[in-house]
């Protein structure tokens, strides 16, 4: 992930009213979710001091007797030094396409079979964003919405991306790991083009940046964003698209198409 931009962002770990419903404080449930991150070898994006600067990592071990975990270090020594000196790491991951977010403090750099790792106490709480009421549709490659970002000060040309999943609350795109266009909690004006029309002028806020590994081994970055501004009728247009794709998929499964 990005190791360059070090601009401060809002501390998105502070649970707002929307996230409070998804806050996990029960020790048994918290350990279970952390254990699942290990078992599923989930990629984690660790933001140093909750800022834009981040590195990809993974949970290696969970010591439930001493309430400590072991986090893999970065291949870049500069990131390891920054993490060692940081007050905390703000970590984002996914479990079965559901966002997991937690903060690690009191990091201690250790050697793990010749590789850098970090030992840290288990977090006191963890956000598990099970927003099932916002049904997310994984979009078909041949029938996907497109997201266009206009030219800006930091880029001379407009940027067009395929939307990989969408709901009534937001959408996601994937970009190369070295893409520095998106920053946490930053707002972006954009145009969302639905296959059925219309083109919607919207504003998006970046909620998470997650590393992912494709089946061919190539690493990419998934950018999850929520709708901050939708034009009148925009929500209905998005729901119509979701309904059409979902209906077509069910018809194919039933042999009707």
Curated annotation (Swiss-Prot):
Gene designation: ycgR
Subcellular location, record wording: Bacterial flagellum basal body
Domain PilZ: 130-244
Quaternary context: Monomer. Interacts with the flagellar basal bodies.
HAMAP family (alphabetical): YcgR
Name used for this protein in its record: Flagellar brake protein YcgR
Any one of the GO CC terms: bacterial-type flagellum basal body
Alphabetized InterPro entries for the sequence: PilZ_domain, Split_barrel_FMN-bd, T3SS_YcgR, T3SS_YcgR_PilZN
Organism: Stenotrophomonas maltophilia (strain R551-3)
Main location: other
Pfam families the record matches: PilZ (PF07238), PilZN (PF07317)
Family statement drawn from the similarity comment of this UniProt entry: Belongs to the YcgR family.
Record's function text: Acts as a flagellar brake, regulating swimming and swarming in a bis-(3'-5') cyclic diguanylic acid (c-di-GMP)-dependent manner. Binds 1 c-di-GMP dimer per subunit. Increasing levels of c-di-GMP lead to decreased motility.
Record flagged with keyword Nucleotide-binding: yes
Keyword 4Fe-4S among UniProt keywords: no
Gene Ontology MF terms in the entry: cyclic-di-GMP binding
Domain of life: Bacteria
A biological process term (GO) from this entry: regulation of bacterial-type flagellum-dependent cell motility by regulation of motor speed
Keyword line: Bacterial flagellum, c-di-GMP, Nucleotide-binding
